[in-house]
Amino acid sequence: METETGKGATAPPAESSGVEQDTAAVGAPADQPPKTNANATSNANGEDQPANGQKANPKDPSRPRRKKARRACFACQRAHLTCGDERPCQRCIKRGLQDACHDGVRKKAKYLHDAPDGALMPGIGGNNFYNNNSMSNGVPSGGINMNGANTVNSAASTQNSSANFYPTPQSNYSLYQENPINHQNSFPSQSPVSPTFSLKTNPTPRNTAPNNNNNNALTSSMPQPATTGVSNAPNQSQNPFAGPFFDPSDPALFNFDLSSMNFENRYGALEFGMLGHMATGAGDSPDSGTHRGSMGRSGSTQFASTPIGGTTTFGESPQNQQPFMFGDPLLNEWPSGQTSGQPHVNVGVYPQSSQGNVIPGHLSKPDAPHAFAIESGPNNFTSPGAATSPQINSGGYEDANAFNNVVTKSNGLSVNGQQRPPTISTPSLKHQSLQMNKRRHRNPSAVYESVKEPYAYTSRFHSLTAFIQRRFSPQKTLQIAKALASIRPSFIATTKTLNRDDLIFMEKCFQRTLWEYEDFINACGTPTIVCRRTGEVAAVGKEFSILTGWKKEVLLGKEPNYNVNTGGSSAANSRNITPRSSVESTGRPHPVFLAELLDDDSVVEFYEDFARLAFGDSRGSVTTRCKLLKYKTKEDMEAAQSDDNGQRWNNHLRKGGIANEAGMNQLGFKDGKVECAYCWTVKRDVFDIPMLIVMNVRLPLP
């Protein structure tokens, strides 16, 4: 009976294919003579049978059924034969094709047509770290050692190396079976923001235990001649995922077996592995910076032109590390933009130094990880208010001119780690920045220190009464007097129990409230004016001055008032065109009354509404139409009477209408009145007495 050589126990009928015809010419290796089976024969299907001619029981324990491989090699795939997980597989070893044994290429799915072929491989060389024959004596079963030599997997190898991707409590959330790392290895790949990887030909053993395996670790070569490696920290097992966390060019990116995850493509395995990295520390609260769930601090290489002490690395023990910002070491390094040879200083949220300095002593070590987080850059994380943030040189706020003494570099970072304030080019932003700088010096405490006397409301009410009698006709004066008389008893009742200290406190409340309103007026683009309960202007916006032509200094009584426009006709008597100086007999300047800014009918209507809101609805408001009087001197009134000016103003309306500040200034040029709508309300003080009249003005809709 003729026997066949080189056939497996369960060889399918394709043994006579073209691939096997080529291997027949090659023959078996010299050091592995062909085996014969005297007790077995081959049937027509190529299956071995016992000598009695009966087919063996497939469930016989002495003949276990071969497990189907996750991916067949190229030769077995082409011959449609059962392959194994190991590389080279047993069939290729028997045929002498161990050097050419590699994973076969499957047909890509439609959604993976754009993916590169290399990314669809389950692992480099199809390594399976969970297989018993995958690793032997530190040499991968693929037959390729890290130093470049090709080896053949020995069938007698019994020692294996496995990776626990799913961590157990005994592994302390570690990705590996941990031992102190005291070995080095490199990969010939480099990332633009990562250390330079160099190729070492003699990897050192991981430890001296009997079951030692020659695994490999990552080392970094520095730009300077000297090289530094990973620190031999005794607590390295406490820090999984050390080193550069996300470096696409690093071959040891995730350090777990992708082929063992039973994924058809590399994309899915990487995504699942990334989620596993994040989940391993999701429930932890890093207290010493040793690990952060998905990234550790130790294990990375140092980056300094001169190592401190010669052995200062990133593998520090927990007691030597500072508590990171929110337990995250990357948050301390957002604005880092230094080169690899430049020392970097991290500033934590809570300074730990007892000498009063902002920077703890151990933070001055130039050991920052030389990598940026995803989508981060040197200048992408400049906080708004960088000029007022705690800087490196002092523990308090620095002045704005302190940046003039700092020598900065082209990348926007200064020598001592400070950042230049962001450049503002937009005019509106420049104005806003200047306003912020001005408001920074304003202190509300000055309000309480400056007010020493109560405000003379009685004398100002007398001045208002005299002005009303001088300007308005007797009929309209009577209407205004009736409105004020209706609220006079309420004023007397609320003020009769107030002493001098109460009146001073009332004025302090007024000034403090006005201090807040000034910021609102500057930020709001609506014409706004704020008056006391006597009607005196206390604050005004720039837009109101543009609309009416009244200067802010004139309204506040800081400049003389030469206005002669009272809203009457040209035939008015002489008292209506007599200018009233803001400096009266007392010699003190006084603000303009609100009644001087409105025409006669609007003033009467205003005081009638004021009598209703003064002690009525505290949240009520009035919205109505009015006519504001433009600020006009005697020369302006004479010029407005000429026909040429009137014709020119009519032509202006027909051509371009109202536009910009110049167009607003032309409003009311002919008759000296600006018809508009306004909304105003009354704000009361702590004694429930009317304190402020806040008025917003806008042009009516056409």
From Swiss-Prot:
List all Polar residues biased stretches: 34-55, 165-200, 218-240, 297-320, 565-585
PROSITE patterns given for it? ZN2_CY6_FUNGAL_2
- Quick one: where's region Disordered? 1-66, 159-246, 281-320, 565-586
Query: Where primarily located?
Result: nucleus
Which keywords appear in this protein's UniProt record, sorted alphabetically? DNA-binding, Gluconeogenesis, Metal-binding, Nucleus, Transcription, Transcription regulation, Zinc
A Gene Ontology molecular function term for this protein is:
RNA polymerase II transcription regulatory region sequence-specific DNA binding
Which segments show compositional bias classed as Low complexity?
Answer: 201-217
GO biological process terms held by the UniProt record: cellular response to starvation; gluconeogenesis
Q: Which InterPro entries match?
A: ERT1_acuK_gluconeogen_tf, PAS_13, Zn2-C6_fun-type_DNA-bd_sf, Zn2Cys6_DnaBD
Designated name of the protein = Transcription activator of gluconeogenesis acuK
Which organism does this record belong to?
A: Emericella nidulans (strain FGSC A4 / ATCC 38163 / CBS 112.46 / NRRL 194 / M139) (Aspergillus nidulans)
